[in-house]
Amino acid sequence: MPSRLPAFRLLLVQLVVVLVAAISLWISWGPVAGYSGLLGGMIAWLPNCYFAYKAFRFSGARAAREIVRSFYAGEAGKLILTAVLFALAFAGVKPLMAPALFGVYLLTLMVSWCAPLLMGKTFTRP
């Protein structure tokens, strides 16, 4: 479980960012912007949850083959799930504010790019 903790911590940080961004959009631009932003964040966050589940199911040297297979399956599933969620959002949600959707989507992805740089960093003097 300790090796899985950073992934789940990152997912929690992403979820908090999604919720704060959606609430901020709701307050400043109205309900359409708010739920559009929430959809964009969920389109990024849910596939990341799927990937984390698939990627960290196995551990240990004996499961090396399963780990690699699981990573590839997780990434493929993440891409497919992202495409399906975008299609569902644009086909099924009217009205939709695309800039809010894409903005929070990108913000959520940026959290996953930047958070590993800050997580677990210890500053010690030489």
Curated annotation (Swiss-Prot):
Record's subcellular location: Cell inner membrane
Annotated protein name in UniProt: ATP synthase protein I
Membrane topology: Multi-pass membrane protein
GO cellular component, one term: plasma membrane
Signal sequence range: none
Keywords assigned by UniProt, alphabetized: Cell inner membrane, Cell membrane, CF(0), Hydrogen ion transport, Ion transport, Membrane, Transmembrane, Transmembrane helix, Transport
Family, similarity comment: Belongs to the bacterial AtpI family.
Transmembrane segments: 10-30, 32-52, 71-93, 98-120
GO terms under biological process: proton transmembrane transport
InterPro entries xrefs: ATP_synth_I
Organism in which the protein naturally occurs: Pseudomonas aeruginosa (strain ATCC 15692 / DSM 22644 / CIP 104116 / JCM 14847 / LMG 12228 / 1C / PRS 101 / PAO1)
Function: A possible function for this protein is to guide the assembly of the membrane sector of the ATPase enzyme complex.
NCBIfam families, per database record: PRK05760.1
One Pfam family hit: ATP-synt_I
Main subcellular location: membrane
Keyword Cell division: no
